[in-house]
């Protein structure tokens, strides 16, 4: 689904609605000064310049205040208009952490009732995520047990040395009506 343009970040979005409140988002940088000025725009541009691929993963929370207090940083407001004119609003935190350490997710708190997981009919669900990285580092960043953050989704840890030394999201497995599909 065409998710629209985020003028403040200099990026364009497409989303794939999934079951259980999940979604995948395809993001590309625009040729716009905001893509170089905002942390998220810089992260997206950097990944695009490296040839594309998985950027990161995101953990949604009902309240970012404890995360702000723990990390000693303030969340940044985000919003974007969809092609139908509706607007999504959220706060996000930790995008710069993704630049420094690609295994780390960033955090999001939705401020609008609407959500990308409702864009279209969801027929697939995330059943497994492969992450190259250090489980303890990610738990420390999250400030909680990983099983709570993943809510029933299996995590497969990949040794970065078997992933060309790269950390971060390696693959997402989707259960579809036609079987499991691995996106890498």
For each of these PLM feature ranges, what is it?
Residues 48-51, 126-135:
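Short, cationic low-complexity segments
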Residues 1, 135-151:
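Extended intrinsically disordered, low-complexity coil regions enriched in Ser, Thr, Gly, Ala
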Residues 4, 12-17, 22-28, 56-58, ...:
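Vicinal oxygen chelate
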Residues 41, 45, 65-68, 139:
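Generic detector of well-ordered alpha-helical segments enriched in charged/polar residues
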Residues 8, 34, 113:
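Surface-exposed, flexible loop/turn segments at secondary-structure boundaries
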Residues 9-10, 53:
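Short, basic and Ser/Thr-rich N-terminal targeting/leader segments
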Residues 17-57:
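Active-site-adjacent scaffolding segments
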Residues 1-7:
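Conserved catalytic-core motifs of GNAT/GCN5-like acyltransferases
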């Amino acid at each position: 689904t065409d998710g629209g343009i985020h003028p403040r970040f200099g990026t364009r979005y497409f989303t794939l609605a999934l079951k259980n409140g999940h979604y995948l988002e395809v993001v590309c940088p625009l040729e716009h000064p905001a893509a170089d000025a905002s942390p998220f725009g810089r992260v997206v541009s950097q990944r695009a310049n490296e040839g594309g691929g998985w950027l990161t993963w995101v953990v949604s929370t009902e309240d970012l205040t404890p995360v702000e207090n723990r990390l000693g940083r303030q969340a940044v407001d985000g919003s974007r208009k969809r092609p139908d004119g509706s607007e999504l609003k959220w706060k996000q935190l930790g995008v710069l952490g993704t630049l420094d350490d690609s295994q780390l997710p960033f955090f999001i708190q939705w401020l609008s009732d609407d959500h990308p997981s409702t864009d279209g009919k969801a027929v697939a669900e995330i059943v497994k995520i492969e992450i190259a990285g250090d489980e303890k580092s990610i738990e420390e960043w999250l400030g909680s047990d990983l099983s709570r953050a993943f809510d029933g989704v299996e995590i497969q840890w990949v040794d970065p040395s078997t992933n060309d030394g790269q950390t971060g999201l390696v693959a997402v497995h989707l259960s579809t009506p036609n079987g499991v599909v691995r996106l890498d």
